[in-house]
Amino acid sequence: MATRGHLGGLSLATSESIRLLDALGSPWILVETVGVGQVEVEIAGKADTTVVVVNPGWGDAVQANKAGLMEVADVFVINKSDRKGAAETQRDLEQMLDLSDLDESSWRPPIVQTTATTSSGISGLWDAVLAHREFATASGELTRRRGVRLREELREIVERRLEDKARQLCTGERWDGLQSDVLAHRTDPWSAADEMLKGIGG
């Protein structure tokens, strides 16, 4: 789904699509973002398990932390692990995990090395995903995440409908008249906005 007009890694229709597939009984739903960076970490708010895929030579541990991926990853994957730098990338990730504030009861994201072209490590990746699901279910983290996700989805729906209502209000003779009043200094923008908002409850 295109992300045009949305400042994030996921399109606005992602939540609805996930909910639809879930209602149809899909046992697993995979969502891929448009890249890896700060705007893509919002996937953590939509997924039960977040898998962060990096390549060898991806960058030092400081950059990994700045991207926010250390905070959202449930599983790390080093793809193209047959290339030079895979061991160094794993070491950087391990060091960042060691320096994080994870306690003994927290989930420690495993680091799995894969090579997609040969399917190497894929079974290990799937085992890591299943292990996280088991942990999240037993610890109550899965229920908590889904509750947070539902609240966020409801907020997004309300915001979207309010935006649609605002677009409807900001047209017509009344809008033009208030705009003229502001330009003529007969009122201020805040008072004009309050006047327009009187109709938003309809």
Give the ranges of each region predicted by the language model.
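Long, well-ordered amphipathic alpha-helical subdomains in the mid-to-C-terminal portions
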Residues: 113, 124-201
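Conserved catalytic network of the ASCE P-loop NTPase/AAA+ motor domain
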Residues: 19-25, 42-47, 67-71, 87, ...
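Conserved nucleotide-binding/hydrolysis micro-motifs of P-loop NTPases
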Residues: 3-5, 35-37, 56-60, 81-84, ...
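Residue-level signature of catalytic and energy-coupling elements of molecular machines
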Residues: 14, 32, 69, 79, ...
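Generic recognition of short, well-ordered alpha-helical segments
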Residues: 9-13, 42-45, 64, 88-91, ...
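Nucleotide-state-sensitive switch-loop elements of NTP-binding domains
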Residues: 1-39, 46-53, 61
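Signal for well-folded cores of large energy- and translation-related assemblies
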Residues: 15, 19-22, 44, 48, ...
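Canonical P-loop GTPase G-domain recognition
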Residues: 72-75, 81-139
